[in-house]
């Protein structure tokens, strides 16, 4: 309910919140499909079920952008797909630059595993060697025997990745805003759907309880 109210107020929902809304919409669709498939008379419930409505536009938008894990997919927009392709290339460039540095400075390197400082790939080298390596120093290890260095050959690829990460965030925010707007446009109906589902769930739970105990409905005369 809070998620729907936030969308109604124009706030941008997170990808996991949008996935929750998608589950609600699909749940409503499932109830309506089940209602059409059963032949047993259920007039007492029909008035309730008839108030349910599927938010088709929001369902389509969310399903096209958010995967089952609550993540924005590459195919959410052509721009995002392109940015992520470029980001993967930047990561490959970083990996290649690291491998070249490790091969050329094997005697200076303490650990061949890439570490990240301030979201930038750096390499752990002997502190005694840090001033002989062209690049940026991000501090020393706890022991003081090694230093985190961003070699000059990594600065360009790291900058490129940071630029792409910023663009990726902007595009994701744009996509989330569009999906949230679609949810907001039908939020009032979906809040009503949620309340109806809660009532139906309560009624079915009571019916199941009575069935398990061979109960019968009282008749007032």
Task: Report each predicted region and the residues it spans.
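Intracellular alpha-helical coupling/juxtamembrane segments of multi-pass membrane proteins
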Residues: 83, 87-90, 168-175, 179-200
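Extended, Lys/Arg-enriched charged tracts that mediate electrostatic binding to polyanionic substrates
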Residues: 81-130, 200
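Glycine/charge-rich, flexible interdomain linkers and switch-proximal surface loops
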Residues: 105-120, 183, 187, 194, ...
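SMC-family hinge/dimerization module
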Residues: 113, 117-149, 158, 218-221
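Extended, charged coiled-coil "arm/hinge" scaffolds of SMC/Rad50-like chromosome-maintenance ATPases
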Residues: 54-67, 156-177
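N-terminal accessory segments that target, anchor, or regulate ATP-driven/P-loop NTPase machines
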Residues: 95, 101-108, 113-115, 143-155, ...
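Coiled-coil heptad-register positions
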Residues: 36, 98, 102-105, 172, ...
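Conserved amphipathic alpha-helical "coupling/scaffold" segments
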Residues: 1-79, 83, 186-189, 193-207, ...
């Amino acid at each position: 309910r809070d998620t729907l109210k936030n969308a109604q107020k124009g706030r941008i929902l997170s990808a996991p919140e949008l996935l929750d809304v998608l589950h609600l919409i699909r749940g409503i669709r499932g109830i309506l499909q089940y209602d059409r498939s059963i032949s047993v008379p259920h007039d007492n419930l029909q008035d309730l079920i008839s108030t349910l409505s599927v938010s088709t536009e929001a369902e389509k938008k969310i399903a096209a952008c958010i995967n089952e894990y609550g993540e924005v997919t590459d195919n959410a927009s052509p721009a995002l797909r392109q940015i992520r392709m470029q980001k993967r290339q930047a990561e490959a460039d970083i990996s290649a630059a690291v491998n070249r540095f490790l091969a050329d400075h094997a005697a200076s390197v303490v650990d061949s595993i890439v570490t990240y400082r301030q979201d930038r790939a750096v390499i752990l080298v002997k502190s005694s060697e840090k001033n002989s390596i062209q690049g940026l120093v991000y501090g020393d290890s706890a022991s003081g025997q090694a230093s985190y260095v961003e070699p000059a050959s990594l600065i360009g690829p790291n900058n490129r990745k940071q630029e792409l990460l910023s663009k990726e965030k902007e595009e994701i925010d744009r996509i989330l805003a569009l999906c949230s707007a679609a949810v907001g446009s039908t939020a009032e109906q979906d809040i009503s759907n949620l309340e109806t589902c809660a009532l139906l769930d309560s009624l079915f739970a009571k019916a199941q309880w009575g069935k398990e105990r061979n109960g019968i409905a009282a008749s007032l005369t």
